[in-house]
């Protein structure tokens, strides 16, 4: 299987997934060259650098298929990166273009925290803004609209009172994202990433 992470950052997800899935090949790109240096070092330290390739690229327009000379990817992942892209809808559509015919796009990102107390939500949004992160209002609805315009299937779930959202997009009917318990840790996101590998 070929797996692409868009906005791979320091390579945490790539290394974790590569160690758990020795049969798969992993690719990633990020706009930050400094983070990619860290990603390369992490992959080498974990002994999975032969199965992880990363390059610099802009999520809104980077053609990963051309860069890596591949026909497409079975899995494409955004992990808390789509909310950092200025034109996130363009980045989403670009990600769909990277999928192979049997491919699936997975998104894990910040939600609108609609069930949080007002003061807690305001503090969290202020803290996220320090890192140039802006949860996208109506992300799930917009993803569903854009995906359906291309005849794609969508399944989505919320975590921890809307703290995060898990979304899967596929050319084939996708299984429902299992409803996780309402808790604050990130184990469900990690399991979601692990489960995406075919």
Where are these regions (language model features)?
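Short N-terminal helix/helix-N-cap motif within the alpha/beta-hydrolase-1
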Residues: 34, 86-90
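A short glycine-rich, Lys/Arg-flanked "PGG" loop and its adjoining helix->strand segment in the class I
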Residues: 89-101
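Core SAM-dependent methyltransferase catalytic element
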Residues: 152-183, 188-197
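A short acidic, Gly/Pro-enriched loop at the edge of an enzyme's catalytic core
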Residues: 64-76
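C-terminal alpha-helical "lid/dimerization" subdomain adjacent to the S-adenosyl-L-methionine
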Residues: 108-163
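Class I SAM-dependent methyltransferase SAM/SAH-binding core
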Residues: 4-6, 10-61
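A short SAM/SAH-binding and catalytic strip from SAM-dependent methyltransferases
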Residues: 74-87
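Short glycine-centered segments of the SAM/dcSAM-binding site in methyltransferase folds
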Residues: 2, 102-104
């Amino acid at each position: 299987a070929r797996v692409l992470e868009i906005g791979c950052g320091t390579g945490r997800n790539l290394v974790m997934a590569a160690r758990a899935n020795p049969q798969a090949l992993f690719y990633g790109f990020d706009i930050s060259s400094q983070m990619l240096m860290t990603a390369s070092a992490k992959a080498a330290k974990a002994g999975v650098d032969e199965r992880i390739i990363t390059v610099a690229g802009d999520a809104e327009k980077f053609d990963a298929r051309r860069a890596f000379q591949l026909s497409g990817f079975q899995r494409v992942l955004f992990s808390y990166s789509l909310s950092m892209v200025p034109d996130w809808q363009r980045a989403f559509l670009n990600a769909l273009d990277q999928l192979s015919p049997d491919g699936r796009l997975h998104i894990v990102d910040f939600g609108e925290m609609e069930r949080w107390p007002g003061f807690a939500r305001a503090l969290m949004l202020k803290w996220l803004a320090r890192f140039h992160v802006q949860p996208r209002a109506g992300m799930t609805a917009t993803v569903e609209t854009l995906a359906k315009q291309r005849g794609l299937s969508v399944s989505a779930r919320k975590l921890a009172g809307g703290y995060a959202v898990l979304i899967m997009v596929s050319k084939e009917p996708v299984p429902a994202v299992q409803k996780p318990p309402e808790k604050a840790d990130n184990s469900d996101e990690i399991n979601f990433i692990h489960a995406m590998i075919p």
